[in-house]
A protein has these predicted regions:
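Short hydrophobic/aromatic-rich beta-strand segments that constitute the beta-sheet cores
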Residues: 39, 60-64, 79-82, 126, ...
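A short, Trp-centered hydrophobic/proline-enriched beta-strand micro-motif
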Residues: 27-47
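An acidic-aromatic
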Residues: 52-100, 159
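Flexible, surface-exposed loop/linker segments and immediately adjacent secondary-structure boundaries
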Residues: 84-123, 128
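Sec-dependent N-terminal signal peptides
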Residues: 4-13
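Gly/Pro-enriched, hydrophobic low-complexity segments
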Residues: 109-183
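Short, solvent-exposed coil/turn segments at beta-strand boundaries
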Residues: 31, 53-59, 74-77, 120-121, ...
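Boundary at the C-terminal end of the N-terminal hydrophobic targeting segment
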Residues: 16-19
Length: 183
C-alpha cells in the first residue's frame, strides 16, 4: 500500500511542477510587474536597436541607439514617438498593436484560449487576431519568458521586435513614462 501511495504522490508532484506550456507562460506573466530589456526592431528591413522598460499595464519607455535622442513612450493612454529630429508623433495607445502587447491581462486571456505553436523546440508562438491586428507573441521554451513580437504597425508596416538581456521585476523610475512635452 505504501508503494502505491508513493507512486501516486510522485506522479501528482511531477504533474504539478511541470505544468503545461500555457500554464507556465501564464504563471510567468502573472508574476511579472515589469520588464527591462535590449531590443532589435526590424520595420520593413530598417533595423533599429535600443533598450526598453515595460511596466504593466500599458506603459513602455524605449530609448533608441540613434544619437540617443529617439524615444518611444506610453503613459498607458497615449503613445509618443520623439524622433532624433525632435519631432513628436502622438497616438492614442488603443489604436496601436502595443495596446494589446502591453496588457498582460489581455495576453493571459488570449493565451488561455489559443493553441501554441512550437518553433524549432526553442520558441513558443501565439497568434492573436484582434480588431484587424495580427500579433504574434514569442516566448522562450526553456524559461517561458517573452522574447519578442511581430505586428503590423499603425502604417501597416511589418514590425518585428527581438528581446535580449531580459530582466524581470526591477526597480524602475516611475517618471520615465511621462510623455515628452510638445515643442
Amino acid at each position: 500500500m505504501k508503494k502505491i501511495l508513493l507512486i501516486f504522490f510522485i506522479i501528482n508532484f511531477s504533474n504539478l511542477s511541470f505544468g503545461s506550456i500555457k500554464e507556465n507562460i501564464i504563471n510567468n506573466l502573472r508574476n511579472t510587474d515589469n520588464l527591462s530589456f535590449d531590443f532589435e526592431q526590424n520595420i520593413n528591413g530598417k533595423i533599429e536597436k535600443g533598450n526598453c522598460v515595460i511596466e504593466y499595464p500599458k506603459k513602455i519607455f524605449c530609448n533608441y541607439n540613434v544619437d540617443d535622442s529617439k524615444i518611444l513612450v506610453s503613459n498607458g493612454r497615449y503613445l509618443v514617438i520623439k524622433t532624433d529630429n525632435n519631432i513628436l508623433y502622438r497616438y492614442s495607445l488603443e489604436r496601436t498593436p502595443l495596446n494589446y502587447i502591453l496588457d498582460k491581462n489581455f495576453l493571459i486571456d488570449e493565451i488561455q484560449d489559443l493553441e501554441e505553436k512550437i518553433i524549432d523546440d526553442k520558441f513558443i508562438n501565439f497568434k492573436i487576431l484582434k480588431d484587424d491586428n495580427e500579433i504574434n507573441i514569442f516566448f522562450n521554451s526553456t524559461n517561458y519568458n517573452l522574447i519578442g513580437w511581430q505586428t503590423l504597425d499603425i502604417y501597416q508596416n511589418l514590425s518585428i521586435t527581438y528581446i535580449s538581456s531580459l530582466k524581470i521585476n526591477q526597480l524602475i523610475e516611475k517618471n520615465i513614462f511621462k510623455l515628452p512635452a510638445s515643442n
